[in-house]
Amino acid sequence: MPSRHVFQLGTALSDPRTPMTNAYLFLLAVLTVLATPGPTNTLLASGSAVAGIRASLPLLLAELAGYLIAVDLVGFLLRPLLAAQPVIGTALKIVVALYLAYMAIQLWRRTGQATSGQAVVTWRGVFIATLLNPKGLIFALAIIPFGRPEVPFYLLAFGLSVVAVGFLWLVAGHLIGAAAGERRRLVPRIASVALVGFAGLIAASAFG
């Protein structure tokens, strides 16, 4: 990647006042943020590791719905409010951290209670985790150029990217589960620990 593009990407991601209007940088930023490990991707991978790719495909719709609602809500309605009242952003981080901790407990319990092949990650769980995912703020404030007439096309490209990257996480989870063999049910347990870690990082950023 040319150094100029690296600089532009870093500038846009660090400054919410500079949403991306260059299609190349837009796709690069979206794919980079989506591919980064986080709560949603952790749930997708752990669900696929236990239930398989086909049974986990509905989770992609949950992820897509969660991201689109979150991004549109922030991009069209909450941008001025978040800029004027930073305390709201802090409160949102605390809520996200608490929910991820709750999700970690639920995932750990369901893993122990579920029978072989039964899904341990639910549609609702992925939807809410994605709706509250801090990545949504990054997309809405720093990447998607809200306010421009072509924003519907950016949202379409964003939605397609969500499904594509999410599917790759399902594949990755399935491969991890296949490699783990009979120990595949440990994958959601590991994922629950990861969710606790994400919750801690988000809580720390809220009070830092």
Task: Give a label for each model feature.
Residues 28, 61-65, 69, 88-91, ...:
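Hydrophobic residues within alpha-helical transmembrane segments
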Residues 21-83, 87, 142-158:
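Juxtamembrane transmembrane-helix termini in multi-pass membrane transport proteins
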Residues 7-36, 57, 116-132, 150-163:
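Small-residue-enriched transmembrane helix starts and helix-helix packing motifs
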Residues 83-112, 165-169, 181-208:
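Selective transmembrane alpha-helices of multi-pass membrane proteins
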Residues 67-70, 129-141, 195:
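Core segments of transmembrane alpha-helices
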Residues 110-125, 178-183:
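Flexible interhelical linker loops that connect adjacent transmembrane helices
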Residues 40, 66-78, 100-103, 137, ...:
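Alpha-helical transmembrane segments and their lipid-water interface positions
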